[in-house]
């Protein structure tokens, strides 16, 4: 009976610690109601208008919530497009005290993204670069704790290999437009290499990988 009471006490202490740490994390988030209202209005005003390689609002919310939950502060986006995903990412980073580096090779998309970031009130949280990600990603020093890859699928694996050493343990690497073969997805070697990438990341023992609709989410558990 004494052992049972002791075990119950330990469990209660552990649960209390988890709850307390969760409350502390929530308190640590930066509160900016005016910015939140501005971003929400921007997203509402532009709902259904995002085209040109942008993600859905659902996927944007997924990225936002991952960053908040992990308290991530150093983010990289490969493939800005016109900025929809970057807005969701930067919005979360505005709450954690972080900053986003985002890169796109297309000058017109880059220009439009800059305007969208400004209108959403998030420019100060974003370092948007017009560059070839094939070269820039290799040059970036990091470290990063969050990555969103949404560029050329046949380069997905190369991007991952280049960033992996720069991703912190506990960090999250997300990739867009990935589907499980069992769900009628791309399969090995299909759709420009995304199938090969999917199989590669799933095989890594130091990553825990799951699929949320079309977003592959990989958490780094250890260096090797």
Question: Where are each of the predicted segments found?
Answer:
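A short alpha-helical cap/connector motif
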Residues: 4-5, 20-146, 153-224
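Bacterial N-terminal signal peptides
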Residues: 8-18
């Amino acid at each position: 009976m004494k052992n049972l009471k002791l075990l119950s006490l330990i469990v209660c202490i552990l649960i209390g610690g988890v709850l307390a740490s969760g409350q502390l994390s929530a308190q640590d988030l930066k509160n900016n109601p005016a910015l939140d209202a501005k971003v929400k209005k921007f997203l509402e005003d532009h709902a259904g208008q995002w085209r040109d390689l942008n993600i859905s609002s659902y996927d944007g919310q997924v990225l936002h919530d991952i960053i908040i939950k992990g308290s991530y502060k150093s983010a990289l986006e490969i493939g800005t497009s016109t900025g929809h995903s970057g807005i969701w990412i930067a919005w979360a980073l505005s709450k954690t005290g972080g900053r986003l580096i985002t890169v796109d090779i297309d000058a017109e998309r880059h220009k439009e993204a800059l305007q969208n970031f400004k209108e959403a009130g998030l420019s100060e949280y974003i370092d948007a670069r017009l560059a070839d990600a094939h070269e820039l990603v290799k040059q970036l020093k990091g470290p990063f704790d969050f990555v969103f890859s949404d560029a050329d699928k046949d380069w997905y694996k190369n991007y991952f290999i280049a960033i992996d050493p720069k991703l912190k343990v506990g960090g999250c690497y997300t990739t867009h437009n990935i589907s499980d073969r069992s769900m009628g997805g791309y399969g090995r070697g299909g759709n420009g290499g995304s199938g090969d990438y999917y199989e590669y990341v799933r095989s890594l023992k130091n990553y825990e990988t799951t699929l949320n609709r079309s977003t592959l989410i990989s958490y780094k558990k250890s260096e090797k």
